[in-house]
């Protein structure tokens, strides 16, 4: 299938950004703060602005809260307990959102944070509430930035899987396209 055929009926896209693609790995130290590369976050904000300017709705699913919190506390990745990862997520989430907010603000774009869990998406009432909230944000050209609510989840934080969350969100918002940005070559299972 040709790219134009795929994009012809496109109205809404979900983009999942993995923590590895916004981290400091192989990137300039000058833009680094709490493990996040501000240069890369600004780059993705510019790209999302271009997509939005073409008339597409964009929903962003982002990882990075646990990493940012871990970096902020000066902890290594190895050996963290579930409660420690949850604490890192709680600390890192606000910094992650602040970084996105500043990058999108430079493009005159507004963002909104939505934290979801499998429990939210498995409960019909909460699922519909999330859907309606996202629809209201998109109607106002606000970019919803969704992350797993890692500070209260247990199973999901063990896996660290926002790929599954992004697929569920794509269904939730009736997206025609899901883009997963990751350092994994191919499909990860």
Listing of model-derived features with the role each one plays in the protein:
Residues 1-189:
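Nucleotide/pyrophosphate-binding catalytic subdomain
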